[in-house]
Amino acid sequence: RELFDGETLVVRIPTWPRKQGGAKNLILNYLVFVLAGMFCLPWALRGLKFDAILVYAPSPITQTIPAILLKWIKRAPLALWVQDLWPESLQATGFVRNQKALSAVGYMVYWIYKGCDLLLAQSKAFIAPLNDYANRSKIRYQPNSFPDQSTDALVDAPAPLLATLESKFCVVFAGNLGQVQALDCVVDAAELLKDHRDISIVLVGSGSKSEWLAQQKLERGLGNLELPGRFSMQTMPSIFNRAGALLVSLEDDPIFELTIPSKIQAYLAAGKPVLASLNGEGAQVVLEAKAGLASPAGDSAALAANILKIKAMAIEERAEMGRQGKSYFLEYFETESQARHLAETLSAMGKGTQ
């Protein structure tokens, strides 16, 4: 037990660590959390009353099962904030390929959704898939948010990175460097642009593709591909502020057309032009906000063309894209306003007036 911000009680339960990954550790992590939650939480929360229960649910969806038990014990309504679609995401990532297993997961998802009083969709495109497993009347749109960091204290990036950011037109990608980020497309775009010596693509972060990226940079002689590593959240604004544009990319898969990558909110908050190399809802947000340019997922030639196009724009034109994106962010994604909306939704659910 601990207090968050000195006033909010946080109760932690044991689970199996993921360690170095692998299917065995992942399955044990999922299973042990469910069992520990069902046995530990009712005891740890004994004597406490709740107006509502909220589950924030990136994978796995099974984390909702202990909350369903708590709902029955505490007689409090349960809201599930869906961040990832099951079984679709299991199939898209290749984690589960057997159709019978996917069907069984589908039945489990139906049961979990049935046990919830309210389903919150992080993307408008989630609503239709959720409706396949639950009644439309209990589905609401609740986007993810990001804090407005314009007044936060900044920490400068290391000098070598700052020198690159200030001497070239830099397209910055920030976040996990993994399989689903379609980094092969980004590397191919860098190769197409390597004769443009005043352009650099900067991939800030780390992940399962970090070693592969370093190898590709060396083998292809990509002096325009920068891999500076990870930095603290306090450092990111100084990097974003010096970027010519910010890049978000995802693989070409139907499941990813439904989601809005969380980095889009962060990019809009930064007030810089956004280059979206993806399909579906994420690209739609960038275009609707008039905050940047979009190209089809996996199309390296189109991405390279958009990089050249945005670089060729007048500085004021790029600045206007940034302003439009920031305005859209403040209206739809800013943390304080979205937190108020979520609190109002949960309050109404607790009073039975949702």
Model-flagged regions — what are they?
Residues 49, 62-65, 69-73, 77, ...:
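Membrane-proximal helix-turn-helix segments that form the acceptor-binding/catalytic region
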Residues 117, 240-257, 272:
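Acidic donor-binding loop of glycosyltransferase active sites
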Residues 125, 142-145:
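Carbohydrate-associated surface elements
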Residues 145-162, 182:
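Acidic anion/phosphate-binding donor-loop and adjacent secondary structure
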Residues 162-181, 187-191, 202:
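Conserved donor-binding/catalytic core segment of Leloir-type glycosyltransferases
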Residues 202-205, 211-238:
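Nucleotide-activated donor-binding/catalytic signature segment of Leloir-type glycosyltransferases, i.e.
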Residues 309, 316-331:
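A short, well-ordered alpha-helix in the C-terminal region of glycosyltransferases
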